[in-house]
Swiss-Prot record:
Recorded family membership: Belongs to the sulfate adenylyltransferase family.
Enzyme class per UniProt: transferase
Molecular function GO labels: ATP binding; sulfate adenylyltransferase (ATP) activity
Keywords: ATP-binding, Nucleotide-binding, Nucleotidyltransferase, Transferase
Species, as recorded: Vesicomyosocius okutanii subsp. Calyptogena okutanii (strain HA)
Biochemical pathway: Sulfur metabolism; hydrogen sulfide biosynthesis; sulfite from sulfate: step 1/3
Highest taxon in the source lineage: Bacteria
Endoplasmic reticulum found in the keyword field: no
Protein name, per record: Sulfate adenylyltransferase
Length: 402
């Protein structure tokens, strides 16, 4: 019997993907249905429901649940859920009771079918204010919400495809069933998830190694879905992480894998979502550092820590491993934190993925205080392949300029 944390909201994963003859029959039927084009974010959510990553959801949220999640971070049933999972359309023709085919807006491939249980309109500004704490269009999450269609469609779904994630990422792309089987095979009971949309710099390595000391293992879990302009692509990031694991971690303490969601950049609320679906993947802990899932200056550096203090004790089984500021200290001669380093600010070099990207985009060398040389080499090769006119200007937020 597995000793891992249970899936969210119950004792079993609830993947919504069809297989075998059922899959083939549903695909044939879907070809005849009215199509709903899905954004990259919606596609990621569909695939996540398909593999059980969003257990126990059975489809896209209705108006009551959208409102409850925005306002209370719970569904109408009382189930904890921090961010609305919704599907939108501009179609005037779709009505309650219709069965529709959900297609990838970029490829037109059919990825799911849905029976529409409700068609409703939302106050997009309300969702932005409650989830993202802003309605400014400079926030990429706000842009996503404001770009949604006029109506939301609710209903249960049947998932018919993983998109191109298995083909593109191979063994790096793992489902919750697969990670749970891996952990069980290793005999791990406690696993810390390390969420990353960046290559791992020295501070990241430091946090992961502390987690290895605390837990049986660490899952370095990379975003494989969409990111904002200027972020490093998943294949490059994965290669950089692989060389770090190979050269600087003990064998059989780390699992590197990825998941299909787009980043929402919702800061504290997204940290809660990250913990929730890591529970479904079998992780007992989520590493939460500075400005988790944040963007620019929209959230304080430890807002994602504090939000775990205000949710109900039984909201999640997976708990946060909270870490203070980490940095390179010249006097300590290595990575330290506010809790371990007694020295002054002039002795410290603050590290961030944003700063790493800024240095590389300006064709500068990464100092060893920032990055292991093997990691730096992978990233330098990638940035050297980008034409100067195609590079995105990277700006540091106030957390690093004050």
């Amino acid at each position: 019997m597995s000793k891992l944390v249970p899936p969210h909201g119950g004792d079993k994963l609830k993947p919504l993907a069809l297989e075998g003859n059922s899959l083939m029959a549903e695909l044939e039927k879907a070809k005849l249905l009215l199509k709903v084009s899905c954004s990259s974010r919606e596609v990621g959510d569909i695939i996540m429901m398909g593999i059980g990553g969003f257990t126990p959801l059975e489809g896209f949220m209705d108006n009551v649940n959208w409102q409850s999640v925005c306002d209370n971070m719970t569904m109408s049933s009382g189930l904890f859920w921090p961010i609305p999972i919704t599907l939108s359309t501009n179609s005037e023709d779709i009505k309650q009771g219709d069965e529709v085919a959900l297609v990838n807006g970029e490829t037109d491939d059919i990825i799911a079918t849905m029976v529409v249980s409700e068609k409703y309109s939302i106050d997009k500004s309300h969702e932005c204010n409650t989830v993202y704490r802003t309605t400014e269009m400079a926030h990429p999450g706000v842009v996503m919400v404001m770009a949604q269609g006029k109506y939301n469609l609710a209903g249960s779904i049947k998932v018919l495809s993983d998109g191109n994630f298995p083909e593109k990422y191979g063994s790096l792309y793992m489902t919750p069933m697969e990670t749970r089987a891996y952990f069980d095979d290793k005999g791990w009971k406690t696993i810390a998830a390390f969420q990353t949309r960046n290559p791992m710099h020295r501070s990241h390595e430091y946090l992961a190694k502390i987690a290895v000391e605390i837990c049986d293992g660490v899952m370095i879990h990379s975003v494989l879905g969409g990111l904002k302009d200027g972020d490093i692509p998943a294949d490059v990031r994965s290669e950089a992480i692989s060389v770090l694991i190979k050269n600087y971690f003990v064998d059989n303490t780390i699992l590197q894998s990825g998941y299909p969601l787009d980043m929402r950049y919702a800061g504290p609320r997204e940290a809660l979502l990250h913990a929730l679906f890591r529970q479904n993947y079998g992780c007992s802990h989520l590493i939460v550092g500075r400005d988790h899932a944040g963007v620019n200056d929209y959230y304080g550096p430890f807002d994602a820590h504090n939000i775990f203090n205000v949710i109900a004790n039984d909201a999640l089984v997976t708990k946060a491993l909270k870490f203070d500021w980490t940095f390179w200290c010249h006097k300590c001669g290595g990575i330290s934190s506010m809790r371990t380093c007694p020295h002054n600010s002039e002795d410290r070099v603050l590290l961030s993925g944003t700063e790493v990207r800024k240095i590389l985009s300006e064709n500068k060398e990464l100092p060893e205080t920032f990055s292991r040389p093997e990691v730096a080499k992978v990233l330098q090769v990638y940035y050297a392949s980008i034409k100067d006119e195609d590079k995105i200007e990277i700006k540091l937020n106030d957390h690093f300029t004050k």
